[in-house]
Amino acid sequence: MDANTFIPEHFIDDVKTYLPAHLDIDDFINACRRPLRKSIRVNTLKISVTEFKQYAKQKNWLLTPIPWCEEGFWLERPAAEEQNLALGNTDLHLSGAMYVQEASSMLPPIALKQSIEHTNYVLDMASAPGSKTSQLAALMNNQGVLVANELSSSRLKVLSATLKRMGVGNCALSHFDGVIFGNYMFECFDSILLDAPCSGEGTVRKDADALKNWSIDSNIEIAQVQKDLIKSAFYALKPGGTLVYSTCTLTPLENQHVCDFLLSEFGDCIIPESLSDLFPGASKATTPEGYLHVWPQTFDSEGFFIAKFKKQASSDNPNLKVKKGAFPFQQFESKKSAVFMQTLKQQFGLNTLPGILMQRDKELWLFPQEFEAVQNKIKYARLGIQLGAIHNNGVRLAHEFATAFGKQCKSNVLPLTDTQANDYFQGKDIRLADVSQNTGEVILTLCGCPIGLGKWQKNKVKNSLPRDLVQNTQLITWAQSN
């Protein structure tokens, strides 16, 4: 138990007013004081669950399946490793093979899974730091268009870095207050996830001070923001589309009441869809409305709320707006495209790229195939994947090319040892045991996952890792420092 976890009495008094009858307040308080179990999600854009399990077994990691996410596991590591090597510094994390993600936060994308597997346009309205965005991209198998929005500039940078590491290629990043989507992107999306900003009452097991500034007045203020966002989400959703609303808080003010607002605002145009059968055992957390209200003691996780809706019919939006300004990209010339693709085939055995080659100044980008329909709706902070920089003698490939498409490359691919990978992430060149006759660029892999680019130079590979990604700490294995 963590005696330092701050749980104010007036918060407990409030919880007592809406705690379900079958749950006990003492169990709730005790659960809030227990350390949160570590959990991870396998990134199937880079590695299969079966392959990941094999690597985990070699490390003596104990994986316990999370019942609602087949890619998710609670994780226990050997004590020595746990004490000496941060989970974020392990090879499976650095390679993008996994994401450290709280178990209950995997639920909102799973609630959208059936919808997004058959749709082209998905919006993640409040995306950072990227756990759910990368999960959505994996469920979409990098197909279609995923618009990921984040209001905070600093969090947007974190989101961008996460998506690069995870090999996400179908994403467009935007930097707005989510309330603009209903006006500028009216009925553009087949599926929308609104994981709304909230009071975070369910996160106290991760953050002992999460409730330090808690008040009902604050709940009420946040709920108004959530209502504005969910109204915008409704307008941005196509008729027949699916909306999932979620928070990591417990109070009905930010959960059921926000859903009630949506239903009263749009009447028969939108209906709730029950999540009681989302996974075996979901009924333990199902509300009378069919929402999921996950309490910390229900599944020994963070607290979470998830609701799912189907848009039945359109409703007029009187505030439609149109973006001004020209689109800064143009399609890459067909002759140059052919030369570029031939180069990729010769160097890496890569025959195709899944998208449209676009140019902005001297930058070469790859956009999702279906992006044209929404490209002029808003100004995007970042689109697709930057493949490289255009020079007179061709294209100098970018780091992102490797992390996104290295898995499909068949030649000039170099698996790194732990020592070599440690050197790579620390910005050092990679020493080779023998002189290589290969020339040009090479895809570097770790745990079977592409992690970046290098350049063959006889008895070494020159490091091409961007400077902002270089890490000056012990990585991969703690035993080296003993």
UniProtKB/Swiss-Prot annotation:
Catalytic residues identified in the record: 248 (nucleophile)
GO biological process: rRNA base methylation
Key words, A-Z: Cytoplasm, Methyltransferase, RNA-binding, rRNA processing, S-adenosyl-L-methionine, Transferase
InterPro entries in the cross-refs: Methyltr_RsmF_N, MeTrfase_RsmB-F_NOP2_cat, MeTrfase_RsmB-F_NOP2_dom, Nol1_Nop2_Fmu_2, Nop2p, RCMT, rRNA_ssu_MeTfrase_F, SAM-dependent_MTases_sf
Cellular component terms per the entry's GO annotation: cytoplasm
List of residues binding S-adenosyl-L-methionine: 126-132, 150, 177, 195
Main location group: cytoplasm
Compartments where located: Cytoplasm
EC number: 2.1.1.178
Substrates-to-products reaction catalysed: cytidine(1407) in 16S rRNA + S-adenosyl-L-methionine = 5-methylcytidine(1407) in 16S rRNA + S-adenosyl-L-homocysteine + H(+)
Any one GO molecular function term: rRNA (cytosine-C5-)-methyltransferase activity
Enzyme class (EC, first level): transferase
Function: Specifically methylates the cytosine at position 1407 (m5C1407) of 16S rRNA.
Family membership noted in the UniProt record: Belongs to the class I-like SAM-binding methyltransferase superfamily. RsmB/NOP family.
HAMAP family: 16SrRNA_methyltr_F
Protein name per Swiss-Prot or TrEMBL: Ribosomal RNA small subunit methyltransferase F
Organism from which the protein derives: Pseudoalteromonas translucida (strain TAC 125)
Gene name for this UniProt entry: rsmF
